[in-house]
């Protein structure tokens, strides 16, 4: 074997006929030069060669591929058909591995064409446009290639010659399977399209093939896993090595189709973006079902699977709720989800506005308390309107001190810590503004179109209004009201109480607001006022089954809510209370005892039962609500020097109702937990941001259970104050754009 020195020359001659140019420098290199030189004698291509193995024309297109042994010791020059002498090119050679790939045109009979086809050694099959040209390339020294760039170059020796028709499409060589003499090696279905192969690297594009063609036995093995990284495609291997390659091929089929490769990072990253991280891709299979989508195939790198033949994978995506990538399939799923949500909303609307059979309307019920086949206030209607059989009630009280309310009442009517608008909103005021219409419209404007003014009543400076959701007014009885003044001979009735009562389904409710006698020492007078009010209010008057009506009005209703300026004070000096307020951070923890509530007069009255028997109050966590300087957060600095007190209070009371015994789940076996209260106070707070009065508003949020009723009660039939509603909506619409400027500002 002869080794060439660093200064030796290597001649590579390539020629193909081209109609446009007879001589043109080749644009790319189709051979691989190695570091270890050896002289190679190409095997002459003749039809009589017994050792010549050729590929079928269908696999190689316009080319015939032949394989021959390379002789390391042969250094003679070879003569082509034209008589020109070509020098042998120096290629690497191993002792046990040698091979030659010879591309040539199939010989045509001399009778059909008189043209002589010359066979020349070529390293480039020619570009797609010019068809190739004659070129002689000199290389002074072997080009250095790193082991990573061509790690298999020392194991193979290649010698190629090819010829191409002018102006022909690119040649496609399918390396689907290259069988050995003893075993057949099947690889993945990959086809390589050679295009623009330059002198430095071979650019490969791959697309998937679907056919396995038989190959004649040869000494060439299949392509490695990463042909771009190694740039080596054939190797001489023994039968044992072929068997190992078959095992490696079977293991590769069980592996995920995606292989992380630095060269094909762009294609691989695009493929990975289309599937969730950590999820293996489904196996490659053609669409057999009639509903399957067939996508057009596009050439892509052989290291990444063909995306066009992959299944949609929607089933796998639907199993993962937290998919965070965006693809065509995901956006389709989102559109399908939007459609399903729309269908679900349509079904819900149809359930709310269900169709009424005509037979049900024709029926008459002979049972007491029913208007038809089903009761309007019965259990079925209650379950449809209130599936949880409970509502929320908002109760607010405020001594307005005769001043007009602020324009914004969101802090009072819709506090920030209330998540949903309550079903019933009750507002009781004392020393109210003379313009009651303005006050009612202001509340209506704040609540919005979902609520209507169900009923309102007034006595002197006392005012009580009940707002309710629009869809609940059809299930209420006719509201009733009553009032009582504790100062009978006074021209200005500032002390007393007003009340409103009604039934919602089968639950009766009573709302009372009162203004009791003032001053620190008049506790007995206030207790007397409460007793007189309870006995004077004649409610209900029109509800059935009221033959055994109690003199105590609070005993005639299921739920009672009492609010107002009750004027009960704290039994501590003013200076001590101011110091305690200044050193205390509000709101107080609800589970801790209040610092000075043990000196509160109302707390003592509730504990003794002298008044408000059976009433309860939630824990107070806010500072005293009386008395402030109007327009500020300072307590009274006038000459009267009133001590801070909790004069504005909200109390509630309920009685056990049959059919509403709801027990909680037993936590300990054999020990039952207490029943759920029919009225529960959820929130209890004040509104310090409103400073128009010397009192701070106080509000409470309750949750109460509702039971079914009968149709024998006088129905309100959708009664509400239409004038208040229309005016409130008109103002709400106008105020919506009041802060917007009429001048268009261009930026």
Curated annotation (Swiss-Prot):
Gene3D superfamilies (alphabetical): Endonuclease/exonuclease/phosphatase
Disulfide bond entries: none
Location in the cell: Cell projection, Cilium
Chief location of this protein within or outside the cell: other
Annotated signal sequence range: none
Record region (Disordered): 1-57, 106-134, 201-224
Reaction(s) catalysed (UniProt annotation): a 1,2-diacyl-sn-glycero-3-phospho-(1D-myo-inositol-4,5-bisphosphate) + H2O = a 1,2-diacyl-sn-glycero-3-phospho-(1D-myo-inositol 4-phosphate) + phosphate
UniProt-listed InterPro entries: Endo/exonu/phosph_ase_sf, IPP-5-Phosphatase_Type_IV, IPPc
GO BP terms: phosphatidylinositol dephosphorylation; protein localization to cilium; sensory perception of sound
SUPFAM superfamilies assigned to the protein according to its UniProt record, in alphabetical order: DNase I-like
Biased composition (Basic residues): 106-120
EC id: 3.1.3.36
One Gene Ontology term of the molecular function aspect: phosphatidylinositol-4,5-bisphosphate 5-phosphatase activity
Entry keywords, A to Z: Cell projection, Hydrolase, Lipid metabolism
Recorded superkingdom: Eukaryota
Disruption phenotype: Viable and fertile, however flies display a decrease in extracellular sound-evoked potentials. This hearing defect is likely due to the increased levels of phosphatidylinositol 4,5-bisphosphate (PtdIns 4,5-P2) in the ciliary base that results in the abnormal localization of membrane proteins such as ktub, iav and nompC.
One GO cellular component, as annotated: membrane
Bias (Polar residues) ranges: 1-28
Family: Belongs to the inositol 1,4,5-trisphosphate 5-phosphatase type IV family.
Function comment: Converts phosphatidylinositol 3,4,5-trisphosphate (PtdIns 3,4,5-P3) to PtdIns-P2, and phosphatidylinositol 4,5-bisphosphate (PtdIns 4,5-P2) to phosphatidylinositol 4-phosphate (PI-4-P). By controlling the phosphoinositide composition of the cilia membrane of auditory receptor neurons, regulates the cilia localization of ktub and consequently the transient receptor potential channels iav and nompC.
Protein's name according to its UniProt entry: Inositol polyphosphate 5-phosphatase E
Organism of derivation: Drosophila melanogaster
């Amino acid at each position: 074997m002869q080794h060439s020195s660093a200064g030796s020359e290597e001649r590579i001659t390539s020629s193909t006929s081209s109609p446009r140019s007879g001589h043109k420098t080749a644009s790319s290199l189709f051979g691989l030069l190695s570091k270890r030189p050896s002289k190679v004698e190409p095997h002459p291509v003749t039809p009589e060669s017994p050792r010549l193995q050729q590929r079928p024309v269908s696999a190689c297109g316009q080319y015939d591929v032949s394989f021959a042994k390379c002789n390391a010791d042969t250094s003679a020059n070879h003569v082509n058909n034209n008589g020109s002498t070509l020098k042998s090119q120096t290629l690497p050679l191993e002792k046990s591995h040698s091979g030659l790939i010879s591309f040539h045109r199939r010989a045509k009979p001399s009778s059909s064409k008189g043209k002589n086809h010359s066979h020349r050694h070529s390293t480039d099959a020619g570009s797609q446009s010019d068809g190739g040209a004659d070129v002689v390339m000199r290389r002074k020294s072997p080009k250095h290639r790193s082991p990573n760039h061509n790690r298999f170059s020392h194991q193979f020796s290649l010698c190629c010659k090819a010829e191409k028709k002018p102006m022909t499409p690119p040649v496609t060589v399918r390396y689907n399977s290259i069988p050995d003499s003893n075993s057949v090696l099947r690889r993945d279905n990959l086809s390589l399209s050679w295009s623009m192969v330059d002198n430095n690297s071979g650019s490969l594009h791959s697309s998937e093939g679907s056919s396995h063609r038989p190959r004649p036995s040869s000494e060439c093995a299949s392509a490695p896993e990463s042909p771009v990284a190694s740039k080596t495609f054939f190797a001489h291997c023994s039968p044992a090595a072929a068997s190992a390659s078959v095992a490696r091929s079977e293991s590769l089929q069980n592996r995920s189709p995606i292989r992380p490769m630095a060269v094909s990072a762009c294609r691989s990253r695009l493929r990975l973006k289309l599937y969730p991280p950590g999820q293996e891709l489904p196996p490659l299979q053609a669409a057999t079902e009639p509903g399957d989508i067939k996508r057009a195939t596009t050439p892509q790198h052989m290291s990444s699977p063909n995306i066009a033949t992959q299944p949609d994978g929607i089933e796998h995506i639907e199993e993962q709720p937290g998919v965070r990538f965006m693809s065509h399939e995901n956006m389709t799923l989102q559109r399908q989800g939007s459609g399903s949500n729309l269908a679900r909303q349509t079904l819900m609307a149809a359930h709310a506005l269900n169709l009424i059979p005509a037979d049900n309307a024709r029926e008459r019920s002979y049972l007491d308390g029913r208007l038809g086949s089903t009761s309007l206030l019965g259990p079925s209607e209650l379950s449809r309107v209130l599936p949880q059989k409970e509502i929320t009630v908002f109760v607010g009280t405020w001594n307005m001190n005769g001043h007009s309310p602020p324009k914004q009442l969101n802090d009072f009517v819709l506090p920030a810590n209330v998540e949903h608008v309550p079903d019933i909103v009750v507002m009781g005021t004392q020393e109210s503004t003379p313009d009651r219409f303005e006050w009612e419209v202001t509340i209506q404007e704040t609540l919005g179109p979902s609520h209507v003014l169900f009923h309102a009543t007034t006595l002197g400076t006392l005012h009580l209004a009940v707002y309710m959701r629009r869809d609940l007014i059809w299930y209420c009885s006719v509201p009733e009201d009553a009032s009582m003044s504790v100062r009978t001979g006074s021209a200005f009735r500032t002390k007393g109480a007003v009340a409103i009562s009604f039934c919602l389904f089968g639950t009766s409710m009573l709302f009372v607001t009162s203004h009791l006698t003032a001053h620190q020492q008049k506790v007995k007078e206030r207790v007397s006022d409460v007793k007189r009010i309870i006995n004077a209010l004649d409610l209900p008057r029109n509800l059935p089954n009221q033959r055994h009506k109690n003199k105590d009005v609070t005993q005639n209703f299921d739920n009672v809510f009492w609010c107002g300026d009750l004027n009960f004070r704290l039994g501590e000096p003013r200076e001590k209370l101011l110091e305690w307020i200044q050193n205390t951070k509000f709101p107080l923890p609800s589970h801790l005892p209040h610092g000075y509530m043990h000196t509160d007069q109302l707390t003592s009255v509730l504990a003794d039962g002298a008044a408000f028997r059976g009433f309860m109050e939630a824990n107070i966590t806010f500072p005293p609500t009386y008395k402030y300087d109007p327009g500020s957060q300072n307590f009274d600095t006038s000459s009267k020097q009133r001590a801070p007190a909790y004069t504005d209070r909200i109390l509630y009371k309920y009685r056990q109702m049959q059919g509403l015994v709801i027990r909680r789940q037993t936590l300990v076996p054999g020990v039952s937990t207490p029943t759920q209260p029919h009225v529960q106070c959820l929130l209890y707070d004040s509104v310090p941001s409103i400073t128009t009065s010397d009192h701070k508003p106080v509000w409470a949020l309750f949750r109460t259970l509702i039971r079914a009723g009968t149709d024998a009660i006088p129905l309100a039939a959708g009664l509400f104050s239409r004038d208040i509603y229309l005016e409130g909506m008109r103002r709400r619409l106008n105020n919506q754009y009041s802060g917007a400027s009429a001048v268009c500002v261009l930026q």
